[in-house]
Structure formats: structure tokens, C-alpha cells
Amino acid sequence: MALSTRTQAACLLLLLLASLSSTTYLHQQMRQTTELQPLHGEESRADIAIPMQKRRKRDTNFPICIFCCKCCNNSQCGICCKT
């Protein structure tokens, strides 16, 4: 019994260390991308808005809709019941 408890504790410790290291890596990557972004805010916002307008309503690769059609009672579920 004590061996399995130690094994569980070791696994939990490894999971915590892995999540901590991945979190710090993601923060580092986010910091690098924000430093590389252009300083012109309006130009970058205009560049982002163009691809958003060209999106289709449904992506055939995923069963979840991009825009919820509100076919069920939960208006923000994101899953279309009609597909």
C-alpha cells in the first residue's frame, strides 16, 4: 500500500513539474511574440480583421460550428444540432 502511495505521489510530482515547465515555456513564447508585433496598432488590427471576414460559417473538419445557430435551448453551446 505504501509503495502505491509513493508511486502516486511521484506521478503527481512529475505532472506538476511538467505543467509548470510548459506554463513557463508558453509565457516565454507569448513574450517573444508580443515583442515581435509591429508598433502600429491600427495597421495590425486591420490585418487581423480581414481574415475574420473571410471565414465560412461551418468548418467541415470539425463538428462544432464557428457560429452557434441557437437551434437548442443553450444559446452559447457552440454545437449545431442540425448538422
From Swiss-Prot:
<keyword id="KW-0165">Cleavage on pair of basic residues</keyword>
<dbReference type="GO" id="GO:0034760">
    <property type="term" value="P:negative regulation of iron ion transmembrane transport"/>
</dbReference>
<dbReference type="GO" id="GO:0006366">
    <property type="term" value="P:transcription by RNA polymerase II"/>
</dbReference>
<keyword id="KW-0372">Hormone</keyword>
<feature type="disulfide bond">
    <location>
        <begin position="68"/>
        <end position="71"/>
    </location>
</feature>
<dbReference type="GO" id="GO:0006954">
    <property type="term" value="P:inflammatory response"/>
</dbReference>
<dbReference type="GO" id="GO:0006879">
    <property type="term" value="P:intracellular iron ion homeostasis"/>
</dbReference>
<feature type="disulfide bond">
    <location>
        <begin position="72"/>
        <end position="80"/>
    </location>
</feature>
<keyword id="KW-1015">Disulfide bond</keyword>
<dbReference type="GO" id="GO:0005615">
    <property type="term" value="C:extracellular space"/>
</dbReference>
<feature type="disulfide bond">
    <location>
        <begin position="69"/>
        <end position="77"/>
    </location>
</feature>
<dbReference type="GO" id="GO:0051649">
    <property type="term" value="P:establishment of localization in cell"/>
</dbReference>
<feature type="signal peptide">
    <location>
        <begin position="1"/>
        <end position="23"/>
    </location>
</feature>
<comment type="subunit">
    <text>Interacts with SLC40A1; this interaction promotes SLC40A1 rapid ubiquitination.</text>
</comment>
<dbReference type="GO" id="GO:0045944">
    <property type="term" value="P:positive regulation of transcription by RNA polymerase II"/>
</dbReference>
<dbReference type="GO" id="GO:0005576">
    <property type="term" value="C:extracellular region"/>
</dbReference>
<keyword id="KW-0964">Secreted</keyword>
<dbReference type="GO" id="GO:0000122">
    <property type="term" value="P:negative regulation of transcription by RNA polymerase II"/>
</dbReference>
<dbReference type="GO" id="GO:0005507">
    <property type="term" value="F:copper ion binding"/>
</dbReference>
<dbReference type="GO" id="GO:0045779">
    <property type="term" value="P:negative regulation of bone resorption"/>
</dbReference>
<dbReference type="GO" id="GO:0007259">
    <property type="term" value="P:cell surface receptor signaling pathway via JAK-STAT"/>
</dbReference>
<keyword id="KW-0732">Signal</keyword>
<dbReference type="GO" id="GO:0042116">
    <property type="term" value="P:macrophage activation"/>
</dbReference>
<feature type="propeptide">
    <location>
        <begin position="24"/>
        <end position="53"/>
    </location>
</feature>
<dbReference type="GO" id="GO:0034755">
    <property type="term" value="P:iron ion transmembrane transport"/>
</dbReference>
<comment type="similarity">
    <text>Belongs to the hepcidin family.</text>
</comment>
<dbReference type="InterPro" id="IPR010500">
    <property type="entry name" value="Hepcidin"/>
</dbReference>
<dbReference type="GO" id="GO:0050728">
    <property type="term" value="P:negative regulation of inflammatory response"/>
</dbReference>
<dbReference type="GO" id="GO:0002262">
    <property type="term" value="P:myeloid cell homeostasis"/>
</dbReference>
<dbReference type="GO" id="GO:0005634">
    <property type="term" value="C:nucleus"/>
</dbReference>
<feature type="disulfide bond">
    <location>
        <begin position="65"/>
        <end position="81"/>
    </location>
</feature>
<comment type="function">
    <text>Liver-produced hormone that constitutes the main circulating regulator of iron absorption and distribution across tissues. Acts by promoting endocytosis and degradation of SLC40A1, leading to the retention of iron in iron-exporting cells and decreased flow of iron into plasma. Controls the major flows of iron into plasma: absorption of dietary iron in the intestine, recycling of iron by macrophages, which phagocytose old erythrocytes and other cells, and mobilization of stored iron from hepatocytes.</text>
</comment>
<dbReference type="GO" id="GO:0060586">
    <property type="term" value="P:multicellular organismal-level iron ion homeostasis"/>
</dbReference>
<dbReference type="GO" id="GO:0042742">
    <property type="term" value="P:defense response to bacterium"/>
</dbReference>
<dbReference type="GO" id="GO:0050832">
    <property type="term" value="P:defense response to fungus"/>
</dbReference>
<dbReference type="GO" id="GO:0045732">
    <property type="term" value="P:positive regulation of protein catabolic process"/>
</dbReference>
<protein>
    <recommendedName>
        <fullName>Hepcidin</fullName>
    </recommendedName>
</protein>
<dbReference type="GO" id="GO:0043032">
    <property type="term" value="P:positive regulation of macrophage activation"/>
</dbReference>
<dbReference type="Pfam" id="PF06446">
    <property type="entry name" value="Hepcidin"/>
</dbReference>
<dbReference type="GO" id="GO:0030163">
    <property type="term" value="P:protein catabolic process"/>
</dbReference>
<dbReference type="GO" id="GO:0005179">
    <property type="term" value="F:hormone activity"/>
</dbReference>
